[in-house]
Design a protein with these regions (language model features):
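Parallel beta-helix/beta-solenoid
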Residues: 1-9
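Primarily the internal scaffold of c-type cytochrome electron-transfer domains
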Residues: 9-236
């Protein structure tokens, strides 16, 4: 499972059904590349190399042509919590139903307040239990995340995406008595606070004991303690 999420593709050398799987070291696409979300691209490249004037993308997956669940499945592959594969690694491709390749742990996607649910790797389960997701018929991971841009830490950008639904003057807008300028810069620290992961720790230079990694909770909610800290920081 580590490889399936941290590389785009690896050719399996072991026989079907044999665990642990072994891989061809010369058949690995390192990192998360285009094919992770757009599917195998050899035919796409071959066609457009020969047909340079054809601007309509052929033989490639475009997320705009997929259903909501198909779009979500691409992310659930690596952000869906404790999903167990039922078919060999790297056989799922975008556009297919993830449930045909994995047993999805739906139980962990319900009791999100349970402290045993880790923020690392279970972003879909947490998001799926949030009111924002439940009350929308179109919300996907791409509603908030642009997979083609590096946006980590840019809270103002994410906050603007929150406010595309939570608009000033509506009942679902922030009730804090702060200026619109202050509110529009950081919805994230209040409603998606960073939480310690119980699954992932990092070793820092000069420290003997690893520290828990902090990951933003994707259970979008009201966190009174985080709101209090936010107001205190603004008033400093």
């Amino acid at each position: 499972r580590c490889l399936e999420c941290h590389v785009t593709y690896a050719g399996i050398s072991s026989a079907p059904g044999v665990e642990p799987e072994e891989y061809h070291h010369d058949q690995i696409i390192f990192g998360v590349d285009c094919e992770k979300c757009h599917g195998p691209a050899a035919d796409h490249v071959a066609f457009h190399t020969e047909n340079t004037r054809d601007t309509m993308a052929k033989y490639i997956i475009n997320s705009s042509s997929l259903s909501r669940q198909q779009n979500l499945d691409m992310c659930v592959l690596c952000h869906g919590g404790n999903i167990q594969k039922t078919k060999p690694s790297f056989t799922y491709t975008p556009g297919r139903s993830l449930a045909d390749y994995f047993k999805i742990d739906t139980l962990s996607m319900v009791a999100v307040q349970n402290e045993n649910i880790d923020v690392h790797g279970n972003q879909y389960g947490l998001l799926r239990s949030s009111k924002c997701f439940k009350q929308s018929t179109t919300m996907t991971c791409n509603t908030c995340h642009n997979p083609h841009e590096k946006e980590r830490g840019k809270t103002a950008i994410f906050s603007q995406r929150c406010m595309s639904c939570h608009t000033p003057g509506h009942d679902n807008f922030c009730k804090l008595k702060l200026s619109l300028t202050q509110l529009s810069k950081n919805c994230i620290d209040c409603h998606m606070p960073a939480r310690k992961s119980m699954a992932v720790a990092v070793s820092l230079p000069g420290e003997e004991v690893p520290r828990a990694a902090f990951v933003r909770s994707h259970f979008i909610s009201i966190y009174p303690d985080e709101t209090k800290k936010m107001i205190e920081n603004i008033n400093k």
